[in-house]
């Protein structure tokens, strides 16, 4: 019943705002983001640049090495450095993903064999960002600038992340961040009300510019891992020859989980 009420409220809100208004706002955000990211030399937007689409942009980021940044490390950096949550993967669109990424049948079968052996991390994919009609101009600029900044210098942070070949997940070297609230911290009081530790810290939108400035300063302070012609390949007994043959993303030696 509760989920039906929530669904009804969603549709009521949509009708109150108006489909035309939603479409106009989202189309405006989408066109501006597509133009800016489309002009960036390290961002490849997937799909037709002219076909009508929803306000979701799927993209991959190239590295100075000639490879790509793994989509999940892009997702991790956006989350950890900017507090932006996006999704990475192939959007449950395997055959279409093959077309978008130019993977032929032979290559697909090679990926399938490696994934079936337990190496989920080799699976190709992309990151995707959505622009909802209700975001402000400041939030829109923050999203666009954060992705552009990662495309500019995100590769510098990759050595500070640990990659799991089994899952394809990347975690910062400092370890897993504790969640704000755990299930075992939630209680029902004597009156039957749910209680839990509250953390209601909120920053104004004016802080977003400061976050971008701090991120730029961090990137500028990091050494370039590709300076001096460092080797692109990783020699590690846990990675098969097939994995190395298929590897399409940067994987510094420091990034392998121990």
Residue ranges of each PLM-predicted region?
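PLP-dependent aminotransferase class I/II
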Residues: 1-9
């Amino acid at each position: 019943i509760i989920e039906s009420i929530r669904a009804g409220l969603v549709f009521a809100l949509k009708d109150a705002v108006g489909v035309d208004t939603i479409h106009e706002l989202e189309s405006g955000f989408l066109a501006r983001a597509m133009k800016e990211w489309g002009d960036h030399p390290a961002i490849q937007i997937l799909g037709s640049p002219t076909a009508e689409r929803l306000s979701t942009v799927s993209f991959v980021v190239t590295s100075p090495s000639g490879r790509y940044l793994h989509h999940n490390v892009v997702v991790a950096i956006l989350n950890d450095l900017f507090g932006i949550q996006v999704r990475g993967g192939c959007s449950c669109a395997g055959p279409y993903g093959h077309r978008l990424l130019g993977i032929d049948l032979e290559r697909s079968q090679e990926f399938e064999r490696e994934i079936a052996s337990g190496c989920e991390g080799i699976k190709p994919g992309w990151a995707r960002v959505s622009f909802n009609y209700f975001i402000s101009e400041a939030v829109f600029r923050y999203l666009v600038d954060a992705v552009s900044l990662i495309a500019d210098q995100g590769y510098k942070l990759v050595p500070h992340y640990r990659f799991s070949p089994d899952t394809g997940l990347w975690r910062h070297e400092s370890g897993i961040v504790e969640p704000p609230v755990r299930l075992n911290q939630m209680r029902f009081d004597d009156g039957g009300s749910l209680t839990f530790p509250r953390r209601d810290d909120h920053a104004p939108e004016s802080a977003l510019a400061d976050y971008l400035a701090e991120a730029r300063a961090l990137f500028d302070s990091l050494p370039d891992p590709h300076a001096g012609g460092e080797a692109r390949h990783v020699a590690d007994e846990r990675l098969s020859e097939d994995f190395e043959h298929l590897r399409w993303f940067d994987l510094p030696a420091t990034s392998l989980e121990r």
